[in-house]
Amino acid sequence: MEKIDFQNGTTKLNKAMFDTFQNNIAKEIDVNEFTNSIGTTFYKIGRLVVMNMAYTASISNLANNKAYTLTTLEEKYRPGKLVVGHAVIKNASYNFIPSSYMQIRTTGEVEIYQNSGSTQNVAQILATLVYVAAS
């Protein structure tokens, strides 16, 4: 990384402070990547976790407003607090099921819900959730 010369009279940052700042930026960020058994990819940067799910499923009779557990996360990917986010859940005809969401419990269970008013058959789940891991 090239160092930028800010010594132009408009900055109050001295050269030693700037060099320290620049060198810290130049350090490589440690990114851990993991793909679980259902093909969901997790990226962990420090404690920040990005979960990206594109799961083709065959889930029959997903009840209205009842949790369905997809998987349980390894401890290092579990959130510090309950995480709830939007999920695109499609039925067997690949039509969107309205009012669908996903949650990740602090115990690691990844659950989906649908609130369409009736029982649905699920064919696909798409979701991206970003959260802070407990550790």
Where are these regions (language model features)?
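Extracellular jelly-roll beta-sandwich "head" domains, especially the C-terminal globular C1q domain
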Residues: 36, 61-72, 80-135
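N-terminal low-complexity, intrinsically disordered "leader/linker" segments enriched in small/polar
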Residues: 1-30
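Extracellular/surface recognition and adhesion modules
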Residues: 18, 42, 49-51, 73
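Short, well-ordered beta-strand segments enriched in hydrophobic/aromatic residues
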Residues: 47-57
